[in-house]
Amino acid sequence: MTILFLTMVISYFSCMKAAPMKEASVRGHGSLAYPGLRTHGTLESLTGPNAGSRGLTSLADTFEHVIEELLDEDQDIQPSEENKDADLYTSRVMLSSQVPLEPPLLFLLEEYKNYLDAANMSMRVRRHSDPARRGELSVCDSTSEWVTAAEKKTAVDMSGATVTVLEKVPVPKGQLKQYFYETKCNPKGYTKEGCRGIDKRHWNSQCRTTQSYVRALTMDNKKRVGWRFIRIDTSCVCTLTIKRGR
């Protein structure tokens, strides 16, 4: 399992060909920025003759360092008072020259962590903790896929303004496409008429797609280009309302 996981990580970084996000003390629109690109500017300034001189840092020194960083359970990130939506930030954006073949790396790391936790259990406990053996089903059916900026076209940023999502991001050796890993309720699933396992005699239920903020290269109505937090579909949740008159 460990060898399989490392193989997936290597293939993941091989197709990504993009720089990671780094900490930046930017107020208002969050604290993450892609290195080598200015936070704000015009589209011409990003694709001009000097664009190639802004070198991008390497992805990571070693794969072990990346895994250790992302799986660090002792790292407790608290949202600031100025930005109370910090718990909605996700890592569902990738810059790549081709459609990613795997879910975001953090999803794979979470699965690997669950595997390590299960490896420490006894065989009997492991059998009983398997969701398939317990007959567990999701309350709402969902579907996840990578979508491009060309499919999204526009999005809503943190200030409530509608911005244009740029399809390509300029880098020293050309351009990379922006991909977004979106999760939404499955319209063809068995829960399109209501949530699974809900007592319909007492409750009205509905599976509803919810959104979170991700960082993306966008352009506002004044043609200003910059990295902003926008909303994308990230989950499918069950909403309940009690039936009246009972």
Curated annotation (Swiss-Prot):
One cellular-component annotation, GO: perinuclear region of cytoplasm
UniProt keyword Secreted present: yes
Keywords annotated in UniProt: Cleavage on pair of basic residues, Disulfide bond, Glycoprotein, Growth factor, Secreted, Signal
GO molecular function per UniProt: growth factor activity; nerve growth factor receptor binding
Main location: secreted
Disulfide bridge partners, by residue number: 140-207, 185-236, 195-238
Gene3D superfamilies documented for this protein: Cystine-knot cytokines
Family the entry assigns: Belongs to the NGF-beta family.
Its job: Important signaling molecule that activates signaling cascades downstream of NTRK2. During development, promotes the survival and differentiation of selected neuronal populations of the peripheral and central nervous systems. Participates in axonal growth, pathfinding and in the modulation of dendritic growth and morphology. Major regulator of synaptic transmission and plasticity at adult synapses in many regions of the CNS.
Protein name, entry field: Neurotrophic factor BDNF precursor form
Species annotation: Gallus gallus
